[in-house]
């Protein structure tokens, strides 16, 4: 997946990016830039407004979840924050802490990683609260 950076907030190695997907929908993602530490609101020299970044989405740091019947949805209620609330459909179980899910964010299945053990089944519709992460592919 390719994302175009619309806005970028930096803090140390952390990057919070308002991005435009190829279908022109907008999302906010978090990723780490280990090759560039930035403090005091300096500008990144590696990633900046207009840059295209390539990678994979995942929902991480899920601290709350439960089975919820309903349509696929997501919202990111906080400005410049990767915080996400979503209803997703379980497609593959990885282990007690992770699964792949169908979302309405994109066509690809997204890895969802939980902070505690969960027991969901294939095709369960679940509500999750976490962080929308972007794993950059070099």
Feature names for model-found ranges:
Residues 17-69:
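Acidic (E/D-rich), amphipathic helical modules within compact regulatory domains
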Residues 48, 66-69, 78, 113, ...:
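A structural signal for the main folded, soluble domain(s) of proteins
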């Amino acid at each position: 997946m390719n994302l175009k950076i619309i806005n970028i907030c930096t803090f140390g190695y952390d990057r919070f990016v308002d991005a435009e997907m190829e279908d022109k929908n907008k999302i906010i993602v978090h990723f780490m830039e280990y090759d560039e530490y930035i403090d005091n609101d300096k500008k990144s020299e590696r990633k900046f407004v207009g840059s295209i970044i390539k990678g994979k989405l995942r929902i991480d740091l899920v601290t709350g979840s439960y089975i919820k019947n309903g349509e696929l949805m997501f919202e990111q209620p906080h400005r410049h924050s990767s915080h996400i609330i979503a209803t997703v459909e379980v497609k593959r179980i990885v282990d007690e802490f992770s699964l792949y899910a169908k979302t309405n964010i994109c066509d690809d299945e997204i890895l969802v990683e939980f902070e505690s053990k969960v027991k969901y089944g294939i095709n369960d519709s679940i509500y999750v609260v976490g962080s929308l992460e972007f794993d950059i592919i070099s």
